[in-house]
Amino acid sequence: MRIALINSQQDVGGVNIKNHLQTLLAAGGRWPLAEQHELTFYEVAGRLIHQDRIDEEVDADLILFISRHASVHPTPALTVHVTGNYEGADLGGEPGRLAPAAPAWMHAILGNLAARAPEGYRVSYEVTHHGPTALSTPSLFVEIGSTATEWADPAAGRAVAESILAAEPQETIDLLGFGGTHYAVRQTEIALSSRGAFGHMVPTRQIGAVDPVLLRTMQEASGAVAGYIDRKSLTKDDAGRIERMLGDAALPLLSESEIQEASGLAWAAYLRVRELAEEIAPGSRVRIHDLRGEGTPAVVRIGPGLIEETIKSDRSGFLKGLDELPVAHLSKGSNEVLSTFICFENESSRLASDITTLCVKLLLICENAVIDGDHLVLRKVRFDPEKARRHGIPKGPLFAMLAGGKAVEIEGRMVTPDAVQTTSVKRIHIPGLERYI
């Protein structure tokens, strides 16, 4: 890939970064950007935000603009973002135009900045803003902010230069972002902890500008496969409006947890898992556990009674056990774990056995359970409030003591816990039960 690194002569921050890039390259060392790509430096006289159509003069597949960052609330910061104007063009570019984004490159550089930032520097995305916008080549800005002190800081310049040279984009989940501040706090945290890579992002203050045409433009300019909404930063009406537009554009809406869970799967495999979940349990939510890579999704069905009793007995233990298995579970409404699971086809037989084994072991530990041939027999003893009332026990301290398993005295009579208990027995048929013990 041919990569152009462009700075402005009048931009102290950009010159700082450029000088450190050239120094590091001259010193040798193994830098992925230099080893894997063809690098060219360009310096312009004017401000970078006014460099519309510079890609017509620069022969490159990717443009990295290296620059200073200014803010009305100055704080030491290292940022990355793509350019564009959702509305007016007060800072270069054209109104309503978005430049092509490079989400995977921004993701890679953002992660490197977080690892290399000097003490006291905040690392974040910035939402889409300013020019240039009239570009055909994917580009991004990498910036030092926010005052002359930071622009000239050699530690910041070196950190940014190293972050650029060390960039090795991986397979990412390219996303659109909606809501939040200028510094895209939630989107930054997601990107730093997952494969979620944001292209164009709209802050809360400009969310009213989003319509179906703009959303489609954002998607095309970002190569996005899904969207993320920072719901806490938007009104319910605005969030709902964006969600409907994403649906109309056939772009999945992912929550933060779904982005995290999807990060271990090939994107096509994740989509197939979601589609299969919708087929077998419409409206259900998918939770991915240790399902990774790619494969053909398949359904694993476990007896609903076994799953239900396991959840009642040890919910956290069951979910923790699932976290160690290459499986996804479904939930719907008040039913936290449906009895239908999804795994890859080549592991379906093993997963059916592993999930059954997990359930049986948890029930044998947590419940008064015995094995009777191919049946797991659960004997449950419960405090019975009606029996307590028949023994003359009023609600209050004595009631609570009996419920807690302690004998009580009332009117000269001792009432023991077993006198106010009800026993129920449930038999769960598990063919070949001895294999799961």
Swiss-Prot record:
Tagged with keyword Metal-binding: yes
GO molecular function, a single term: D-aminoacyl-tRNA deacylase activity
Gene: dtdA
Stated name of the protein: D-aminoacyl-tRNA deacylase
Highest rank taxon of the organism: Archaea
Signal peptide (UniProt feature, chain positions): none
Cofactors demanded by this protein: Zn(2+)
InterPro entries, per database record: Deacylase_DtdA_archaea (IPR018033), DtdA (IPR007508)
Top enzyme class: hydrolase
UniProt keyword list: Hydrolase, Metal-binding, Zinc
Pfam families: tRNA_deacylase
Cofactor binding mode and count: Binds 2 Zn(2+) ions per subunit.
Any single biological process term in GO: D-amino acid catabolic process
Family recorded in the similarity comment: Belongs to the DtdA deacylase family.
Subunit composition and interactions: Monomer.
Record function comment: D-aminoacyl-tRNA deacylase with broad substrate specificity. By recycling D-aminoacyl-tRNA to D-amino acids and free tRNA molecules, this enzyme counteracts the toxicity associated with the formation of D-aminoacyl-tRNA entities in vivo.
